Amino acid sequence: MAGGVLFFVIMLPGPASDLGRYMDLLSARQKLVASNIANADTPGYQTQDIDFQFEFVTMANGQQPQTIRPRGLKQTPDGNNVDLDREARLLAEDAIRFNVASSLLRGQIKVVQEAIQGGGNA
């Protein structure tokens, strides 16, 4: 998001602010997934992720989410546990989530802009 839009989102109450935080978490997860993919052949590398439910409830605006190491992933003999199929699935799912959230946020911003410009008068 552009700096002005991010500031605008932070200043919005309730759902818009929550959408902004949710999108921040999705962005952070995308970076982790990209790192996981980049390290798929690195001996000893352990997959990292974000616990969305915990982080969404506890994360303050602007604070970086804590990473977790997902359990139950198959480890290779060199100690690496990156599952490229899992990472590709996460990228696709999160892209869809981000698109939905950004559409909802655009709608909320449009309502506020119309109210500010006087277009919301009945």
Residue spans of the language-model regions?
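Amphipathic alpha-helical polymerization modules
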Residues: A2-A122
